[in-house]
């Protein structure tokens, strides 16, 4: 697997290491002790292609750099493709061995089928468990382990082994839900968040700094929606009992580094800083990309 790591253009001065030179020195220093890591400089001098042995390998490096004071943006993980002698695209294939409680067998088979997995074998295991064996592209497993643990309520076990390279099996839709995107720069307020929380799950609370193009939550539907979470209520001379009621917000979902890396889509980046994790669109300007612009009352 590989991820693109690049300098964050919206730099935070309080962090110690924010330039592309700092990132380059740190990544190439890691090569001295990690023989399974590969670092490639991209044509864009701000970006580096970092390849490793899997999601965990790369996430450990990201967390270590974060704790050391580095600030950077990370793309969604991608697999390394090959081509055969005829120029046909090949992708890595793995065998997934899964032990799952009987009542969760259906949802696991459904989810892996959506990720181009092929069920090879199915049998009965001990203690009310079912043993499943899937052949699945490596990219189909990207971001799935956290979803698997949620679907099986922490009772499932999954192990994988590399099989080889096979012809490309088609596109995979990693997420069914779209993103909630801020289109105003400022500070989130309760009034704006109260209107936005009806559209899906929020990742931020009131009093947090946001900017245009920042992902502030997950939409309940498939498309991306732009919202203004910085808007305040217009004051009037008319008061009513309903207007004076306190607005109650659902507690936001705070993503860990692993959850954020799993969540981001191919058109998004994860901003990693020592103190915060922020998800953003690669193209911040909504005028150059098609989003649903929604103005809530």
Positions of the model-derived regions?
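A common structural junction motif
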Residues: 31-35, 65-72, 113-120, 149-157
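Catalytic P-loop NTP-binding/switch module of NTPases
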Residues: 7-10, 14-45, 67
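Single conserved hydrophobic/aromatic residue that forms the stacking wall/gate
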Residues: 1-9, 13, 293-296
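Short glycine-/aliphatic-rich beta-strand segments at the starts of folded cytosolic domains
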Residues: 10, 14-16, 90-100
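Flexible, glycine/charged-enriched surface loops at secondary-structure junctions
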Residues: 34-42, 120-122, 155-160, 271-273
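Short amphipathic alpha-helix segments
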Residues: 19-30, 100-115
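Conserved structured catalytic cores and adjacent interaction surfaces
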Residues: 38-84, 93-94, 101-107, 131, ...
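Long insertion/accessory domains within large nucleic-acid-processing enzymes
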Residues: 136, 147-266, 271-294
């Amino acid at each position: 697997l590989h991820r693109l790591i690049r300098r964050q253009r919206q730099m935070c001065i309080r962090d110690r290491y924010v330039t592309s030179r700092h990132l380059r020195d740190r990544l190439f220093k890691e090569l001295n002790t990690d023989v399974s890591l590969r670092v490639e400089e991209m044509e864009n001098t701000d970006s580096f292609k970092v390849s490793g042995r899997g999601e965990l390998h790369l996430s450990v490096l990201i967390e270590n750099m974060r704790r050391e004071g580095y600030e950077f943006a990370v793309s969604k993980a991608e697999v390394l493709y090959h081509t055969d002698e005829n120029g046909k695209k090949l992708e890595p294939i793995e065998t997934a061995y899964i032990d799952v409680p009987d009542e969760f067998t259906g949802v696991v088979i459904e989810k892996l089928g959506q990720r181009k997995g092929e069920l090879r074998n199915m049998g009965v295991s001990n203690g009310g468990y079912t043993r499943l064996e899937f052949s699945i592209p490596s990219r189909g497993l990207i971001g799935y382990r956290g979803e698997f643990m949620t679907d099986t309520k922490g009772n499932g076990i999954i192990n994988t082994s590399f099989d080889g390279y096979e012809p490309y099996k088609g596109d995979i839709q990693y997420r069914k839900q779209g993103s909630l995107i801020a289109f105003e720069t400022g500070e989130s307020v309760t009034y704006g968040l109260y209107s936005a929380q009806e559209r899906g799950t929020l990742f931020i609370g009131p009093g947090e700094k946001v900017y245009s193009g920042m992902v502030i939550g997950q939409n309940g539907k498939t498309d991306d929606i732009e919202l203004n979470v910085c808007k305040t209520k217009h004051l009037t001379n008319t008061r009513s009992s309903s207007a004076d009621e306190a607005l109650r917000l659902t507690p936001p979902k705070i993503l860990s580094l692993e959850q954020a890396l799993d969540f981001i889509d191919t058109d998004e980046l994860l901003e990693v800083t020592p103190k915060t994790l922020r998800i953003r669109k690669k193209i911040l300007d909504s005028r150059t990309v098609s989003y649903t612009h929604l103005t809530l009352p």
